[in-house]
Regions:
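Acidic, glycine-rich loop-and-beta core segments that form the ion-binding/anion-interacting portion
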Residues: 187-248
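Charged (often Lys/Glu-rich) extended helix/loop segments that serve as interaction or gating elements
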Residues: 5, 230, 243-295
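Generic N-terminal amphipathic, Lys/Arg-enriched alpha-helix
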Residues: 4-16
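Active-site-proximal beta-alpha core segment in soluble small-molecule metabolic enzymes
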Residues: 39-205, 230, 234, 267
Length: 295
């Protein structure tokens, strides 16, 4: 954004303030679509910046909603349920009942555990409504299910009349090195091919969070363009031929925001220069968790 515009915003809204260039946000998503091609889906992980969820609705194929606060934001913004991917993380039966009551068959849901699968199975059977689900594969932490549990669940419900398994969801973290991302993608390719060969299970979609690293500071090397090319090449080399949807937050949102703060005082202590500003460190930390829990 131009300096004159930022100065005008600072005068109008006062500081500290976040200023978001929504045209830049939209263009970033369009650039990503051009880079990966029309066959690769794009999902906006709104935890990166919940303020941009409604802007993402018309550009991304879907919006990943993690917390109940994020769901409430989308509901208030009247974002269509068909654009929502509902994460199973930290969802109680009461939470799921509220979400299902609003979204029903229109949304896509990720399943984090056998317990969640049982709840969705019961809900869909009682109402005779079909629900599309993604089974989340754990990366070795507390999220998702390990491979044995996931395969067991696939076998258990692959022919269920109301639960349709659309594919697998995988996300292991953010700000990763591209070598790790490509390695994870190849392991997922091996698993998807093994499911076809050994179990006769053909899945339609892989929802994959690449966790591309974003340069936030002036001295950081910005490698995202090279990493996008490498990731696109790796997707093209997959032996499994289903649809890949890339779930991204920072890679879409980081470049469109500017944080404004005003220097209120300057001084020198012990030979070191200091600026006292009206902003706080809490305002440049990861905002998604706070905004998502308390909309």
């Amino acid at each position: 954004m131009k300096k004159e515009l930022l100065e005008s915003c600072a005068a109008m809204y006062r500081t500290p303030a976040y200023i978001f260039d929504t045209d830049c946000f939209r263009q970033t998503i369009r650039n990503l679509r051009d880079s990966f091609g029309k066959d690769v889906g794009l999902c906006y992980a709104m935890k990166a910046n919940p303020f941009l969820a409604d802007r993402a609705e018309n550009e991304a194929d879907r919006i990943e909603i993690c917390s109940m606060g994020e769901f409430q934001i989308c509901r208030e913004k009247r974002i269509e349920p068909k654009k929502m991917l509902i994460s199973g993380v930290m969802k109680s039966p009461e939470d799921l009942a509220e979400i299902l009551g609003y979204c029903g068959e229109d949304s896509l849901y990720t399943v984090e555990s056998m317990r969640q699968a049982d709840y969705l199975e019961s809900w869909s059977r009682q109402r005779e409504k079909k629900i599309r689900i993604l089974l989340r594969l754990s990366s070795g932490n507390q999220f998702g299910m390990d491979e044995d549990t996931l395969i067991h669940l696939l076998q258990k419900i692959q022919n269920h009349p109301y639960l349709k398994i659309q594919g697998i969801h995988y996300f292991s973290g953010t700000q990763k090195q591209i070598a790790k991302t490509v390695g994870e993608l190849r392991k997922l390719d091996d698993l998807l091919k093994r499911l076809e060969k050994e179990y006769g299970i053909q899945l339609e979609e892989l929802e994959f969070g690449p966790g591309l690293a974003v340069a936030y500071f002036d001295r950081q090397k910005d490698c995202i363009r090279e990493e996008i090319r490498e990731l696109s090449r790796a997707i093209g080399e997959l032996r499994w031929k289903g649809k890949v949807t890339l779930e991204m937050g920072r890679a879409m949102a980081a470049s469109c925001g500017t944080y404004l703060t005003t220097v209120k005082d300057t001084k020198q202590n012990g030979g070191r220069n200091y600026c006292i500003v009206d902003g706080g460190i809490h305002q440049i930390h990861y905002d998604g968790q706070i905004r998502g829990m308390y909309p």
